Amino acid sequence: MRPGVQALIVPSKKFKTVRIDVHFLKNATVAELAPRTLVANLLETSTQRYVNQIQFTHALSAMYGASFGVGAGKKGNLHDIGFSITVANDHYTGGQSLVRMAIEFLNEVISHPLASNGRFDEQTFARQKTNLINYVDSATEDKQFWASQQLRKLAFGANRIQGVPSYGRRADLQNLQNEQVYATYLSMLRHDLVHISVSGDVDEQKVLEDLAILELPERKVQLGSVITKFNSLPKPRHRVANQAVQQARLNLAYDIPATVVSDNFHAAVVFNALFGGSPQS
């Protein structure tokens, strides 16, 4: 589409729906995990046009119950804020272009958040920050999740990107300020690599024309490798924690010579399943 903004159109007649994904990618840092996660939560709930959840839901209902979501997470050494919407194929709507409506909706969500004067709406910001902290606190009650996080710290180190949960550190979440999070949003909007994918029974040229609706200026982006590696360890690290629970948890991590792009990736997946990494093991 333009420098720093990529589009992939995948025409397919297999489905009765069309899915549109917009991903904002940048090199991940520990300090930015918390504010970027909160940005995703804020953009998922309100905009200048749809100021509350009721109006937001009505907008989706007008597209015959379109499904929509925003998520934030790590992709190897990269961080991704992703927007996804799925609508019925235009062939089933009597000529109404739901694909164009969906792109207009995404543009409203991405480029016109409920904010003014360099700050998100105060009430919305406070609510979403509290909700995120409550989620983090409740997640630590999941013992399997807790054990997995302790293993990540052992394997990667507590202050490396892979040793920290995708939502960041709780202390960072607690200290987030409105202006800081809004600045993170502007940086995402202006500087992240944007990857857009559209899949379904669509006309490729028409979709590209509709994607021009998105207010995404060109940008120069230089991303590092998505592949992450362990630090070399002279001997295995161990941690044993005794807690008042009914079941014991055993989590293991191995550094193996395989990546998602290597020829032996599928062999590594089978190995992982055999060693307990799958319910089928």
Residue ranges, per PLM feature:
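Scaffold signal of the M16-like zinc-metallopeptidase fold and its non-catalytic homologs
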Residues: 133-190
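An aromatic/glycine/proline-enriched structural segment found at the starts
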Residues: 162, 171, 187-259
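Short, polar/flexible loop-turn hinges at active-site or ligand-entry regions and domain interfaces
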Residues: 46-49, 90-93, 112-121
